[in-house]
């Protein structure tokens, strides 16, 4: 049984809202620190990162509240028990009439009848609550079915951007190495092959990016904020995992490799302007495309070739 299904493991709404207030306060403190530490050249990237962190936290908190309302069996009790409805008024009138009719009935029989009515009313309340929960789940499922096809919308938007920029998407295997494989493909395509190490591969690119991060720690502090724990990541643990595993690469690795190869790296994506890292790089620009919704495994990078 999951935490959402088990009443014992559920937070109450007061706990959730208190946690959300703390998360918002912690994030605001981190954002303030990130902006103070950002250099002038990194200010635009840091501001974009801060907005992204705020959007993700807001969405996460809204989803938690919605899920709690759907799954928590107590959500209807306090609100609906105190609500005066026509049905409850009729029920009360019926109870009063029955009590008058039973005035001449032996006390024992009256008590048995009242106990039975109390049990029936409890059963009715439980039935109403279960019906309300079922209705909420149906409405949530209906709402989900009305959501737009994000994968289709994203792909159509990227196709249009590529056509406008005279680029075509070159498929890279969707795994944890996709960013590095895309950059490797771009290096072979757009840089002088004579200057590229013959043994260059995704693992070598991982090592190069991690080595650069270690040598320029202060430049990467704004990017090391963990959205799940709301704390800064340990840079040594981060680079160790990134170098030796198939961990997905992202902004940190793109920025690092743009400096390693002294070239701009541009990221085309749906719904946002093209993001360019190290715009002042002297070597030819490397061009990638980023997908958020199009692949089952999650976020993905492909290489962009000229059409």
Curated annotation (Swiss-Prot):
Residues 103-114 have a biased composition (Low complexity). CDD domains: OTU_fungi_OTU2-like. InterPro entries: OTU2-like_OTU, OTU_dom, Papain-like_cys_pep_sf, Peptidase_C85-like. Pfam families: OTU. Residues 167-307 form the OTU domain. Residues 23-46, 96-130 are annotated as: Disordered. Present with 172 molecules/cell in log phase SD medium. PANTHER family: DEUBIQUITINASE OTUD6B (PTHR12419:SF10), OTU DOMAIN CONTAINING PROTEIN (PTHR12419). This is OTU domain-containing protein 2. It comes from Saccharomyces cerevisiae (strain ATCC 204508 / S288c). The gene is OTU2.
